[in-house]
């Protein structure tokens, strides 16, 4: 049986089970709304550096936030994926689903992924259907990214050691209508972090958490 056939069979017979504690309940407990900031841009543009500093500032404010870093994810959850077009798509599909779980759990997720293709980013936006999803384009020229090259990856890619490397031997499609642009060739790190924090304060954190009654608990075991 093919993989696609197995997936269709599982999808047909697996039933979603709702929790008795909702996302809204968790947001009320946390005293803030949850949501996803999706940082896209070339390697070395500054995505993870900015996101981790934003996370630290949110932590100081007692706001629950978590960074998903593209390299870190490939050490575990996505360690079986490469960098072909198909694997890149699956890499982002998995992250979108995990991000949804974290957002449902009440977190502000800061996802840092090159995510070079517009259709993949559009898929992620559609999965959240406008539900506190915001795309942040961390903009930086390929020349500047090569100059920075903190991991030495561009050097290897230019020498042909690393294939399918975004910006060198694989394309990066710039966002056409991102929710926020951070140009790290123009803005310093402190200003970049503050810009994201200000953006959060006017979007995800601006909404008032509203109360609701908890889902009635079952009186008997059903499964």
Q: What spans do the regions from the language model cover?
A:
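Extreme N-terminal, non-catalytic leader segments
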Residues: 1-36
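The conserved Walker
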Residues: 43
